[in-house]
Amino acid sequence: MNNIRAERVGEQMKQEIMDIVNNKVKDPRVGFLTITDVELTNDLSQAKVYLTVLGNDKEVDNTFKALHKATGFIKSELGSRMRLRIIPELTFEYDESIEYGNKIERMIQELHKNDK
């Protein structure tokens, strides 16, 4: 039962954090990013926010520094938007699955091109 609630809250947090980052965080270091997933512990005390950033390594690094600095602001905004007793501690992590999927896709295309 708790697991289903954690998934529902995670989906809502994903939408709210995207809105906060896009519309409220004014740090110019925040690049174009997409939140791919939010994983919550069953007690909703910690949340891992997985995201991808469009850009080179320096832009990715700058975006993570800006998000780390804005974590308190994002938490306070979440507190006013969501009805939770305790707002989870946020941890931002880079989601490499998109890059990995693109790499696999390129390899498959190369194999098909070599077969012809």
From Swiss-Prot:
GO terms for molecular function: ribosomal small subunit binding. Belongs to the RbfA family. One of several proteins that assist in the late maturation steps of the functional core of the 30S ribosomal subunit. Associates with free 30S ribosomal subunits (but not with 30S subunits that are part of 70S ribosomes or polysomes). Required for efficient processing of 16S rRNA. May interact with the 5'-terminal helix region of 16S rRNA. Keywords: Cytoplasm, Ribosome biogenesis. It comes from Staphylococcus epidermidis (strain ATCC 35984 / DSM 28319 / BCRC 17069 / CCUG 31568 / BM 3577 / RP62A). The keyword Protein biosynthesis does not apply. SUPFAM superfamilies: Ribosome-binding factor A, RbfA. Monomer. Binds 30S ribosomal subunits, but not 50S ribosomal subunits or 70S ribosomes. This is Ribosome-binding factor A. It holds the Pfam family RBFA. It is found in: Cytoplasm. GO terms for biological process: maturation of SSU-rRNA. GO terms for cellular component: cytosol.
